């Protein structure tokens, strides 16, 4: 029997429903050429709502081919594995409230983010996915495929996804009669993830520290330090940055 003692975030709470959010966009190398399109559609939707967008991972590379000269010190080659590290640090520190991510299929980024406590990432192909995930599962990240099915009208689909994701109060349930049960299960899931995982700093220290260093690019650090509310995570990031 699971005894619920309180979630990482209170699913469906009034604070979460009404708050102005800080949203991080994270792209990896294979789809980074689409970053300007994704960023533009995200800002077009959420900035009029009062939300702030941070572009914390890759921008468009210098050339479309995956070759060394495509990347720079400020825009290095990041994979979906790096995105999980970024998301875990930003969400658990309180530096951001929500993450939009993805990769070619969306599956790699989904798995990478969901490894970590405090991160509940859903898979989103079309607007109904975004709406139902946030009403039923009340998570804090969405992974989108940016190659598979990303053809004519993709920018319109992104716009509609972001509108459904951020245009309604979260955790209201679908159907509405299921709200109480769905909110309870979403909260228990967050608690279970914390219970079965290592504490985040311990988990990050167990990783290849070179990979962690690679994830801490300047755009990420600007966002992290501007909003970090967790002294332990800040101290860990400080130590990694100092060792670079």
Model-assigned labels for residue ranges:
Residues 95-105, 121:
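A short, small-residue-rich loop immediately preceding and capping a beta-strand
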Residues 70-97:
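Short, structured active-site "lid" loops
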Residues 35, 84, 106-112:
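Short glycine/serine/threonine-rich phosphate/pyrophosphate-binding segments
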Residues 108-121, 125-129:
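Short Gly/Thr/Asp-enriched flexible loops that form oxyanion-binding sites at enzyme active sites
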Residues 24, 31-35, 131-239, 243:
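C-terminal binding/interaction regions
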Residues 50-73:
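A short beta-strand-loop structural module common to alpha/beta enzyme folds
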Residues 15-45:
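N-terminal beta1-alpha1 ligand-phosphate binding loop
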Residues 1-16:
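Short N-terminal or domain-adjacent regulatory/targeting segments
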């Amino acid at each position: 029997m699971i005894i619920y003692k309180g979630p990482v975030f209170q699913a469906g709470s009034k604070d979460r429903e009404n708050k102005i959010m800080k949203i991080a966009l994270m792209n990896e190398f294979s789809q980074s050429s689409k970053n300007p399109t994704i960023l533009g559609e995200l800002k077009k939707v959420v900035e009029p709502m009062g939300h702030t967008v941070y572009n914390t991972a890759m921008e468009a590379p210098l050339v479309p081919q995956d070759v060394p000269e495509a990347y720079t010190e400020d825009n290095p080659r990041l994979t979906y594995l790096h995105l999980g590290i970024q998301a875990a640090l930003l969400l658990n520190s309180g530096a951001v409230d929500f993450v939009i991510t993805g990769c070619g299929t969306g599956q790699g980024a989904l798995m990478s983010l969901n490894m970590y406590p405090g991160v509940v990432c859903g898979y989103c192909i079309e607007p109904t996915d975004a709406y139902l995930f946030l009403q039923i599962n009340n998570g804090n990240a969405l992974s989108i495929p940016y190659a598979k099915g990303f053809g004519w009208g993709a920018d319109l689909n992104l716009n509609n996804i972001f509108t459904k994701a951020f245009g309604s109060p979260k955790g209201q349930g679908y159907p509405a009669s299921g709200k109480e049960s769905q909110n309870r299960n979403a909260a228990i899931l967050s608690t279970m993830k914390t219970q079965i995982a290592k504490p985040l700093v311990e988990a990050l220290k167990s990783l290849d520290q070179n990979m962690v260093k690679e994830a801490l690019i300047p755009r990420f650090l600007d966002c992290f330090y501007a909003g970090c509310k967790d002294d332990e995570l800040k101290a860990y990031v400080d130590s990694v940055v100092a060792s670079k």
